[in-house]
C-alpha cells in the first residue's frame, strides 16, 4: 500500500475494472467521452481513478438521465455514468461482490454473475410441474424509492472497507443531468444503469429484497422454501 494514501486499492483491480467496463460497452455520460476516447489516454485515466479513490478525493460527476419507455406505459429514467465513473464503480463492485455473492439466495437471479433472466424462467418452468399456482408481482418504483440511509446501513454490515461506504454515499447523492441540461438533486433511489446498481439495491438479508418499507412484500420475498424466484424488480412465488 502507498503510505501516502488513505485507502488500500489495487492498481491491478483498477485495470481489471476498465476491462470489464470495456466488455460491457455502453454509451457516453455527461462529458460525452466514449470508451475509445478514454482508452486513448488509458494510463493517465486509470492513474487518475486510482489516485483519487485511494486518497478519498474521488467525487462522481452528474449522471446523464435518459428517459426510456416502460412496457406497462410511461417512462423510467436510465442513469448513464461517465466512462471514468463506471470504472470507479466497477472497482467497488470487484471488491464488494465476492463478499456479498455467497450470501445471496440461490433463487435470486437479478444482476448476479453467471445468472440471467433465462435461468429464472427455466426455474419457473421446472416448478410449474410441481405447483399448481403462481403469484407474480412487480415492486413499483423499486429503484426510484430506495432509502439511502437504510441502504448504507445494510451495506455497512457486509464490508469493513470504509472507502466503499464513502463512495457509495457519494454515488447515491450524485445528481441527474436532464436532457435540457438542468441538474436534479436526488434524495432517494439509485439510478438504473450504474455498475454497482445491484450491490446498492439488494442486500443478502431477507431474500435480497431491496431496502423496502413495505414489510408484507419483504416477508413474501423471504418465503424461499415455497419456490421463490427473483429477477430484478419482477418476482414470482410458486406453491
Walk through the language-model features, giving the residues of each.
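Short helix-capping/linker segments at secondary-structure and domain boundaries
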Residues: 96-103
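Conserved phosphate-binding loops in nucleotide/dinucleotide-binding enzymes
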Residues: 77-78, 82
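Nucleotide/phosphate-binding loop and acidic/charged catalytic motifs
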Residues: 92
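Duplex nucleic acid-engaging cores and interfaces of nucleic-acid transaction enzymes
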Residues: 84, 88
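Non-catalytic, polymerase-adjacent accessory regions of viral genome-replication enzymes
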Residues: 1-43
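Intein modules and their embedded homing endonuclease domains
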Residues: 40-41, 48-51
Amino acid at each position: 500500500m502507498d503510505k501516502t494514501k488513505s485507502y488500500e486499492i489495487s492498481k491491478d483491480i483498477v485495470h481489471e475494472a476498465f476491462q470489464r467496463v470495456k466488455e460491457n460497452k455502453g454509451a457516453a455520460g455527461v462529458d460525452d467521452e466514449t470508451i475509445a476516447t478514454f482508452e486513448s489516454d488509458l494510463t493517465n485515466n486509470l492513474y487518475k481513478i486510482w489516485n483519487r479513490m485511494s486518497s478519498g478525493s474521488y467525487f462522481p460527476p452528474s449522471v446523464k438521465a435518459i428517459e426510456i419507455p416502460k412496457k406497462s406505459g410511461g417512462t423510467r429514467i436510465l442513469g448513464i455514468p461517465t466512462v471514468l465513473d463506471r470504472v470507479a464503480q466497477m472497482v467497488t463492485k470487484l471488491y464488494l461482490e465476492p463478499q456479498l455473492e455467497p450470501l445471496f439466495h440461490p433463487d435470486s437471479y437479478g444482476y448476479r454473475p453467471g445468472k440471467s433472466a433465462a435461468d429464472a424462467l427455466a426455474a419457473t418452468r421446472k416448478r410449474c410441474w410441481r405447483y399448481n399456482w403462481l403469484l407474480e408481482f412487480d415492486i413499483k418504483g423499486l429503484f426510484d424509492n430506495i432509502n439511502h440511509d437504510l441502504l448504507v446501513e445494510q451495506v455497512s454490515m457486509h464490508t469493513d472497507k470504509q472507502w466503499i461506504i464513502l463512495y457509495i454515499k457519494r454515488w447515491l447523492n450524485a445528481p441527474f443531468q436532464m436532457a435540457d441540461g438542468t441538474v436534479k438533486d436526488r434524495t432517494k433511489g439509485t439510478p438504473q444503469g450504474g455498475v454497482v446498481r445491484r450491490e446498492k439495491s439488494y442486500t443478502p438479508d431477507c431474500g435480497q429484497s431491496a431496502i423496502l418499507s413495505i414489510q408484507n412484500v419483504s416477508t413474501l420475498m423471504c418465503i424461499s422454501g415455497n419456490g421463490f424466484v427473483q429477477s430484478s424488480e419482477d418476482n414470482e412465488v410458486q406453491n
